[in-house]
């Protein structure tokens, strides 16, 4: 009891700087022990010895309390080490004694220890500072809300304008893209049309050439005489009319070329001229006239049937597809092949037409007559009554 009072007198009653320093140092530097015992109690007990019995009693109580404390801590599952617990209690005690704060005037950290307590002026200043800070925060919130609202409205307007502009730009870009695509398509179409026109013109040219070739085509039976006639005419003219010395000219080509030029003048040739054969009769030296439309080229004069010496090779400027003379002669000697008739061209006997059953004429069937309509072949005897027979019999008698 005396020890407890002494502790109260040291800690609370006489709160001097020296006593607080002694207690704090004892609490900081003591070793492992319990709250009920330890170095502070031991020093108090040693500092106030009265009698030997009191010392023994206190010592016995100290041991029993330490033993019971140790047992209770082990049963509750607490950690045996009390250094951490004591430090935690000491920090809580200091926190309860006073708060650490900042002085508004000096802007320095104020300790909460008993020697450095916060004054009334600092408390008032701190309160005003908190109020000012709260008002500033509220003002800032209001201003921020107003600015945000204003920006929101303006932002919507600007967004609408931007959207309209973007829509117009998109439409303009889309129109430009469509125009460019149409131009590209038009160019491709024109190119394709040009290609088809070339193909069509080429086909027309080939068709015209084929028609000309078939028009100028002569049967093999008339080629030999015609070629002799053409060679004779070329030799007679001596290229005076501009005709090339080519014996394979067709009748149509010769006719066309000689028809546009005037007839050449008559020329006399000597017998020593190598261009004509000595076997050629003098009647054939007459200048032939250009053939007319009614001339029969298939029947040339007899003097033209005489063969002539071989002529010069054909020139490169004439592109006429007439076979050579040897081929013509070989074809002329061959007998003409019989013409093949197609199945559609063959005349077949007319097939009898099929008639329907309704169209076929059948003999008329005899009509059935009724029994009343049929005329009897021999008249049947009429039956007489008995009264008439009796009367007649009586009369005869």
From Swiss-Prot:
Pfam families: NPIP. Its main location: nucleus. Residues 256-397 are annotated as: Disordered. GO terms for cellular component: nucleus. Residues 267-277 have a biased composition (Polar residues). Residues 278-287 have a biased composition (Low complexity). Keywords: Nucleus. PANTHER family: NUCLEAR PORE COMPLEX INTERACTING PROTEIN, NUCLEAR PORE COMPLEX-INTERACTING PROTEIN FAMILY MEMBER A1-RELATED. This is Nuclear pore complex-interacting protein family member B2. The keyword Nucleus applies. It is found in: Nucleus. InterPro entries: NPIP (IPR009443), NPIP_N (IPR054697). The keyword Membrane does not apply. Residues 382-391 have a biased composition (Basic residues). Belongs to the NPIP family.
């Amino acid at each position: 009891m005396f020890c407890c009072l002494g502790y109260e007198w040291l800690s609370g009653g006489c709160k001097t700087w020296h006593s607080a320093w002694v207690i704090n140092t004892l609490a900081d530097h003591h070793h492992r022990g319990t709250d009920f015992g330890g170095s502070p109690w031991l020093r108090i007990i040693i500092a106030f010895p009265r009698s030997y019995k009191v010392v023994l009693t206190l010592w016995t109580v100290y041991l029993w309390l330490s033993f019971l404390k140790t047992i209770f801590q082990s049963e509750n599952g607490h950690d045996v080490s009390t250094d951490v617990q004591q430090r935690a209690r000491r920090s809580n005690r200091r926190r309860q004694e006073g708060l650490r704060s900042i002085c508004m005037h000096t802007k320095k950290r104020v300790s909460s220890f008993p020697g450095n307590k916060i004054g009334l002026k600092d408390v008032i200043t701190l309160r005003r500072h908190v109020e000012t800070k709260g008002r500033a925060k509220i003002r800032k919130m209001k201003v921020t809300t107003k600015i945000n609202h204003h920006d929101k409205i303006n932002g919507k307007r600007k967004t609408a304008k931007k959207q309209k502009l973007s829509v117009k730009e998109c439409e303009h870009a889309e129109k430009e893209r469509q125009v460019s695509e149409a131009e590209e398509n038009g160019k491709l179409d024109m190119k394709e049309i040009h290609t088809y026109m070339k193909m069509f013109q080429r086909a027309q040219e080939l068709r015209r050439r084929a028609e000309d070739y078939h028009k100028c085509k002569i049967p093999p039976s008339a080629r030999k005489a015609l070629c002799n006639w053409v060679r004779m005419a070329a030799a007679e003219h001596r290229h005076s009319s501009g005709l090339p010395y080519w014996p394979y000219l067709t009748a149509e080509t010769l006719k066309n070329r000689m028809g546009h030029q005037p007839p050449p003048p008559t020329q006399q040739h000597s017998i020593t001229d190598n261009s004509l054969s000595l076997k050629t009769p003098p009647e054939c030296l007459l200048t032939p006239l250009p053939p007319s439309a009614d001339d029969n080229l298939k029947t040339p004069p007899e003097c033209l049937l005489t063969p002539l010496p071989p002529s010069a090779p054909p020139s490169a400027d004439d592109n006429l597809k007439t076979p050579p003379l040897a081929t013509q002669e070989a074809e002329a000697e061959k007998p003409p092949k019989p013409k093949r008739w197609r199945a559609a061209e063959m005349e077949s006997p007319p097939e009898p037409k099929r008639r329907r059953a309704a169209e076929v004429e059948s003999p008329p069937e005899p009509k059935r007559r009724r029994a009343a309509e049929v005329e009897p072949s021999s008249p049947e005897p009429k039956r007489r009554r008995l009264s008439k027979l009796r009367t007649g019999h009586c009369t005869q008698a």
